[in-house]
Amino acid sequence: KQSLEQNEALIDFTDFVSETNGRRYAAYIINKVQQYPLLKSLFAEKQIDSLGIVRPDMFYEEDYAQDVLKLLWEPLKEHFSEGSTVYYVPSQLLFQISLESLPLPDGSLLGSHYHFVRLSSARELVKMKENKVCNRVHTAVLYGGLQYDMEPTAMIEEAKKYDLSNLLAVRGDVVRGDSIFRELRGSKEEVIKVESVLKKKKWNVASYVGKNGTEESFLDMNSKSPMVLHLATHGFYYTPNKAGDINYLKGYTDAMSLSGLVLSGGNAAWLGKKLPIGVLGGILTANDIARLDLGNTDMVVLSACKSGQGKATSEGLYGLQRAFKKAGVGTIVMSLWGVSDKVTSEFMVAFYEQLVNGKVWNKRKAFENAKMIV
């Protein structure tokens, strides 16, 4: 409450399980005026399920958006004046929904009437308001244009570059998978452009492309991670039910095991091929990430997160977010649905230009400016 201004408010969404209606959603509203948080009941999850939405982008289609607005925003809107700043913290299913992107009946977006700011937790509001100039060493590690198919000899050569003997991240034998991950052609160009933007500002940048972006290279950042970590690669997230169809993931039920990132050479492990001795598989789960110390990293950017396998669920998105938070990362920027390589690349270049050219290290302002530019 102390971090809010007069024209600002916080919506902290929550959920609970009812014996009669299953999972239900509610929202705590906090502003500068009220002495205590206001609790508003919203809807049962089965009401959203009944709409027949099977992909996150469908929330914003005309046939569904109005029903979503009635369930999610109509019970809340009386508490916010137009033009005010509304911070919000999602919960469960709501991780899939961007409030500002919901279309209104008149064709405008909800975000054109309010300034929405999405947070990973209410605590993030306090940190954000500090808005200090970042005095960390300007270092960045960029992954993109990765080669997911590699010969065993190439995998061995890349693995030899890193000594991971002190890293306690032991995993069992790889089991069989099925489909493969395709090259993200625009991601290499994206990394080259972002590297150029950062180097113009005298940043120390290391880029991993092609065969170089291995799991070994990622784990080697443990306890010596960069200020910025940019990952333009495939991500995957599965529900426990869907995971049963993927041999690689069978037997796992928690979101931290069913979500992750694919690095160089990852197809071999995903397909269940025998890996050379001393070589890691290139499939980095959220659990693997959570075990690392990435405390030096102020921001992780996942710019191609949904372009891989499976359905982007709230649990899956939350799995990756939680993993990087547990590893000590300050801010996570990630996509909720697929965007073309060209648009993604243009947005990322604009985002980094806005970020490094500002007098203050303000990630959220840079993000908003980049959206307007692209």
What are these regions (language model features)?
Residues 1-55, 59-374:
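Catalytic cores of enzymes
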